[in-house]
């Protein structure tokens, strides 16, 4: 499996590039608009074809790269079914699968930080967007956030995953 964690220091956003192998289909989670050229360069270096670009939620701290990636690669843009974003061509529900060649992610609805927050699990990893952060959680005081829903998402969904799950 190809797994690259990419960091945008301006917004503090982690993005993730995933594929089963060189020359395969790829997906990217939480792309930042200003980093689109870098993502495309990396995919070219790894001989990957972007087929899906995913946002875990509507972001207030950066402009999403979904639209630019769709326009430049014709990839499918993906978010959870509760999103109000208009750039989305595929909306997923809790319990759905997000599949590309050789890789499958499970979809978990994890509202709280926003009302459209979703997490994605892949083997021993979970991609939580801003639901869980390093040393904390995402804010709940804007974007239809709800502290009680976030508590429930963290303690009754995410912390119920296997103990060896990487966040």
Task: Mark where each language-model region is.
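Active-site HxH/HxHxD metal-binding segment of metal-dependent hydrolases
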Residues: 12, 23, 33-109
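Generic anion/oxyanion-binding catalytic loop in active/binding sites
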Residues: 28, 58, 139
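Divalent metal-coordination and catalytic microenvironments
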Residues: 18, 30, 57, 69, ...
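Conserved beta-strand hairpin/beta-sheet module of binuclear metal-dependent hydrolase folds
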Residues: 1-49, 119-128, 135
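Metallo-beta-lactamase
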Residues: 24, 104, 114-167
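Residue-level preference for alpha-helix termini and adjacent loops
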Residues: 5, 62, 82-84, 91, ...
